[in-house]
Amino acid sequence: MNKEKLLKKKILSANKKIIHDGFKAKSIGNFGNVSCKYKNFCLIKPSGVNLAKTDHNDISVVRLDDLKLFTGKKPSVDTPIHAILYKSYPEIKAIVHTHSLYASSWAQSLKSIPCYGTTHADYFADEVPVTNILNSNQIKKNYEKEIGISIINKLKTKSLNPWQIPGILVAQHGVFSWGKTIDEALYNAEVIEFIAQLAFNSSFLNKKIKKISKSLHFKHFMRKNGPLAYYGQ
């Protein structure tokens, strides 16, 4: 099996996993998407398809330079978001977009997910940030591209890179996560949803809860992700 065919099958499987694992409300409709970068192309879920009736050959193959469809069905409307992230951060090889319940709740509340414990610190070097709200001109002009720009701007403002922050909340929208592989990007989406629920529960149980100390946060992140990482359980 050639690499492109394998990646298409993985994308299809990952999109189905989002549904089966409860990353979306089944009764609401079809939202969320998974993509990967392959050479100078973005392979992404087609727009508005019934995944139960979708074949890997239907996966959209879009040129990153001009967003023109190369093969497959009409691509997801979110393709410009994925494309600008791939072009801005070469280390990103796969992206997952979900509207998972707890993480999207934080996004809709316009609140970054604070780090209250070491589980969060194991995966994120900082809070899980939320982007700024788009203004009316940005929404009307080029909505999806502006979302991508807002993600990049937030990371730059906080002096963070995709290795330090493997995902982000998009204001009033949902979640984008990324990784070096499709499996890693999907795993990071799961992590964000888990720590979003942890933070919600923790703040509910203790209204005066404080964020984890910077020293403990740094220790946990670096022992798992740093150049001298030694974490393992």
Language-model features and meaning:
Residues 1-233:
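Glycine-rich flexible loops
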